[in-house]
Swiss-Prot record:
InterPro entries, A to Z: Ribosomal_bL28/bL31-like_sf, Ribosomal_bL31, Ribosomal_bL31_sf
Gene Ontology cellular-component terms listed: ribonucleoprotein complex; ribosome
Gene it is expressed from: rpmE
UniProt name for this protein: Large ribosomal subunit protein bL31
Sequence similarity: Belongs to the bacterial ribosomal protein bL31 family. Type A subfamily.
A biological-process GO annotation: translation
Pfam families recorded: Ribosomal_L31 (PF01197)
Keywords: Ribonucleoprotein, Ribosomal protein, RNA-binding, rRNA-binding
Functional description taken from the UniProt entry: Binds the 23S rRNA.
GO molecular function: rRNA binding; structural constituent of ribosome
PROSITE patterns: RIBOSOMAL_L31
Organism: Rickettsia typhi (strain ATCC VR-144 / Wilmington)
Oligomer and partners: Part of the 50S ribosomal subunit.
Length: 78
């Protein structure tokens, strides 16, 4: 391998709440602070289903607000 063309492979700390996970990476910063705990995501945790309901409510509100908007490109030209 050529010298000087590969990124530096170093220790990376991933902070989730009060937990710290250590791994190796080529990430330029040595630390990542997670805003959302992946262990509490509704896809893996059935107890936090209200997050999905809130998301569905937001989508429903959006659809109500923009129900008349159409991006259909199959309209006939006059």
């Amino acid at each position: 391998m050529k010298n000087g063309i590969h990124p530096e492979y170093k220790k990376l700390l991933i902070k989730v709440g009060s937990n710290i996970f250590e791994t190796m990476s080529t990430h330029p910063i040595g630390e990542i602070l997670m805003d959302v705990d992946f262990r509490k995501h509704p896809a893996w945790n059935k107890d936090s289903g209200n997050v999905v309901n809130q998301s569905n409510k937001s989508v429903s509100d959006f659809n109500k607000r923009f129900s008349g908007l159409s991006f259909d490109s199959k309209k006939e030209a006059s």
